[in-house]
């Protein structure tokens, strides 16, 4: 072999050794170095003490960074002890985000629509079994309001930016009836035999009624007042409430069908929100000061006179009447100092961490019922015997049930 060939051979061998060493080093770093090495420490995910796997919420955990922590409004962290002898069992009803909950006639099932797709399901209790009731598809569903007869519901959904509604007419079927486009608010009559709704057009708000099948629609009143919400507490009386804001005075008006008169019932009151009792004999209201803070509750009789003011800071929409003398409310453990109510809550910028309490109007006693987990409770539903309470968590959209014994 000549000298040139020997030099080439030496060079090739040297390059091979270098490449082999580099490959070995790369393999070591990428494949073997991590084996046996301690993992980087991770911050443990907080969970509820009594409900494993569910994150504990703070006083304000909404989208707005103002509510990540800090000071809370005076009096909003009041302790509410659990009543003596009360025992509760929490169970999951719907794992997927849902809305439009309602009880069956026999009060042995809770109905709910899946938010993604709008299918109607039922959860039987206490058995804990589930069954699909309708496969109708509802895209961009907003809400559903069940009739007092518990066999049909007014369903609203978004078509682009336009709100559309229809009447879901039968459990276990896909029978529907179209309602007018642009319904702003709707309600059932106390017996469920009729429905009423509000639409806005040409600078006016129109109040119209229809039968329980959505037929025989008739406009019965018009007003220049805009952005109203509707309730039907008594057969001949309709309650019209102005859009609530903590920084703007609000009103509740009563329209009497027989006389055609519109009269002021409550207001001007900042942060005014409301919830009528089942028979329309009482009204639960929430209000604030002129800055949208210092939230308070009050209960009025049918004339508007205040009859009781429990020392609680919550919104009526987080409450449910079990009967004329009993109200259940979800009460935040604290309200952030910078929160304006009900504005921030209704815009979805604020979530609350709630306890569940009962308000007895006969004894004027407020007692704790449930004080676990990190739930922003809404759409509370209570059985007549008060042994089962259901709520939707606004944070996750899941539906939960609570069995109460004492």
Over which residues does each language-model region extend?
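Sequence/structural signature of beta-propeller modules
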Residues: 1-90, 406
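Beta-strand-rich domains and repeat architectures in extracellular enzymes and scaffolds
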Residues: 58-121, 138-144, 377
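Conserved beta-propeller blade repeats
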Residues: 95-104, 137-154, 175-198, 217-241, ...
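Short, solvent-exposed loop/turn segments at conserved positions within beta-propeller repeat blades
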Residues: 113-116, 158-163, 200-204, 244-249, ...
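Short coil turn/linker residues within repeat-based beta-strand modules
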Residues: 117, 126-129, 170-174, 213-216, ...
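Beta-propeller blade signature
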Residues: 167-171, 210-212, 253-258, 297-302, ...
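Short, conserved, GDST-rich strand-edge loop motifs in beta-rich repeat architectures
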Residues: 330-351, 401
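Blade-level signature of beta-propeller repeat domains, shared across WD40, Kelch, NHL, RCC1
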Residues: 380-406
């Amino acid at each position: 072999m000549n000298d040139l060939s020997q030099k080439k051979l030496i060079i090739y061998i040297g390059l091979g050794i270098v490449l082999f060493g580099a490959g070995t080093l790369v393999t070591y770093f990428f494949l073997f170095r991590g084996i046996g090495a301690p993992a980087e420490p991770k911050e443990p995910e907080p969970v509820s003490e009594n409900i494993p796997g569910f994150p504990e919420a703070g006083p304000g955990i909404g989208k707005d960074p103002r509510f990540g922590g800090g000071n809370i409004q005076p009096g909003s962290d009041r302790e509410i002890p659990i009543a003596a002898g009360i025992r509760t069992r929490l169970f999951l009803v719907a794992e997927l985000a849902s809305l439009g909950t309602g009880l069956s006639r026999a009060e042995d099932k809770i109905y709910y629509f899946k938010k993604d797709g709008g299918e109607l399901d039922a959860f039987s209790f206490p058995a804990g079994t589930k069954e699909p009731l309708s496969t109708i598809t509802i895209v961009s569903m907003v809400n559903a309001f069940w009739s007092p007869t518990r066999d049909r519901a007014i369903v609203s959904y978004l078509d682009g930016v336009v709100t559309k509604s229809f009447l879901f007419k039968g459990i276990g079927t896909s029978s529907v009836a179209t309602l007018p486009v642009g319904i702003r608010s709707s309600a059932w009559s106390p017996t469920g035999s009729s429905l009423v709704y509000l639409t806005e057009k040409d600078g006016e708000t129109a109040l119209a009624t229809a039968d329980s099948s959505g037929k025989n629609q008739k406009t019965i009143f018009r007003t220049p007042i805009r952005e109203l919400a509707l309730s039907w507490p008594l057969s001949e009386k309709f309650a019209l409430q102005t859009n609530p804001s903590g920084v703007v005075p609000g009103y509740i008006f009563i329209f009497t069908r027989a006389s055609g008169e519109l009269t002021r019932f409550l207001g001007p009151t900042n942060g005014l929100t409301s919830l009528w009792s089942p028979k329309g004999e009482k009204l639960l209201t929430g209000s604030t000061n002129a800055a949208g803070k210092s939230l308070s509750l009050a209960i009025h009789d049918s004339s508007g006179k205040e009859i009781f003011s429990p020392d609680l800071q919550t919104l009526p929409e987080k409450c449910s009447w079990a009967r004329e003398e009993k109200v259940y409310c979800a009460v935040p453990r604290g309200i952030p100092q910078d929160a304006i109510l009900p504005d921030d809550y209704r815009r979805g910028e604020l979530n609350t961490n709630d306890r569940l309490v009962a308000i007895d109007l006969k004894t004027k006693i407020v007692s704790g019922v449930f004080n676990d987990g990190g739930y922003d409770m809404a759409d509370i539903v209570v059985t007549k015997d008060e042994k089962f309470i259901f709520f939707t968590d606004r944070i996750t959209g899941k539906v939960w049930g609570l069995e109460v014994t004492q």
